[in-house]
């Protein structure tokens, strides 16, 4: 099997720019051809998950997120079904609130089966 594509995927967004407008860091940059480029240097999701620095750039707004950022995803019409299906319930929210004050051992144990375990404890504390 080869990685060949005969027809490029069409931009199904049309004139919708909800994601561009929702991004707190304006990281979706317009290109001359009408497409957009995600400038990860501005993206809160990149910084809260992948950036291992002790501090985050001052210009990056986290908009209440300590892990990732879903502002663009939450407004996308393509994601409406997924967004309503995977919303946090009160139990999930309570567990995350408890982690805010957790020590490192508790954090590691509580997140071992979660996507949240991708970040180090120091990043978790930095991002709050």
What does each of the following model-derived ranges do?
Residues 1-21:
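Glycine-rich adenosyl-nucleotide cofactor-binding module
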Residues 1-7, 37-57, 104-108:
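Short, charged low-complexity linear segments at domain edges
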Residues 6-11, 24-25, 32-33, 55:
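A short secondary-structure junction signal
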Residues 7, 60-63, 115-119:
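Short, solvent-exposed segments of well-ordered alpha helices
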Residues 14, 67, 119, 123:
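Residue-level signal for the nucleotide or nucleotide-sugar donor/cofactor binding architecture
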Residues 18-48, 61-67, 71-90:
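Iron-sulfur cluster-binding cysteine motifs and their immediate structural context
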Residues 93-104, 109-114:
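Alpha-helical adaptor scaffolds
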Residues 109-112, 117-127:
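Long, compositionally biased charged/polar accessory segments in the mid-to-C-terminal portions
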């Amino acid at each position: 099997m080869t990685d060949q594509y005969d027809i490029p995927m069409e931009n199904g967004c049309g004139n919708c720019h909800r994601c561009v407008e929702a991004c707190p860091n304006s990281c979706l940059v317009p290109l001359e051809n009408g497409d957009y480029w995600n400038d990860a240097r501005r993206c809160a999701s990149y910084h809260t998950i992948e950036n291992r620095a002790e501090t985050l750039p001052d210009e990056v707004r986290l908009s209440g997120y300590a892990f990732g950022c879903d502002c663009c995803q939450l407004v996308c019409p393509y994601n409406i079904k997924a967004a309503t299906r995977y919303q946090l319930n009160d139990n999930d929210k309570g567990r995350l609130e408890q982690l805010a004050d957790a020590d490192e051992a508790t954090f590691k144990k509580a997140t071992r089966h979660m996507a949240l375990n991708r970040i180090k404890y120091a990043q978790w504390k930095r991002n709050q």
